[in-house]
Amino acid sequence: MIKISGKCSWFGGPLDHGVDPDEGLAFIYSVDEAPHLFLATQPAGTSGLARRLNPFVNYIACRWNYDETSVEKLLTTMVIVHSPKTKKTIRAFPADWGPHVDTGRIADLSQGAMRRLGITTDDTVNVSFPDGEELTS
């Protein structure tokens, strides 16, 4: 099992003005590859997948090591995200690579995931990538 721990923030969805309106994702190139992650329609004034992510779905961006976890595995596996502060745990879909190293954070989560965990930007999360736990739906 791969485990990392550190600070987090939120990203994606129509309200994320920290990403350009036409910004894509690192390993998902079309809505058809992971339709469960996206809003039904593209938000007005945008064309990129980052702003089309559904903020109510639990998704996560981490600096995935593609040698350890291939893109194919990322698209078929959920990770476990735990907040030591609130003691809450969720499962989340890998959706992107990030955050940038300069942020000092290890993960970016959807707004919905952060809300379910009861955390805010720069709170600590523990992220676990279980071996062999693939999505069944």
What residue spans do the PLM features occupy?
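Secreted/periplasmic proteins
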Residues: 1-137
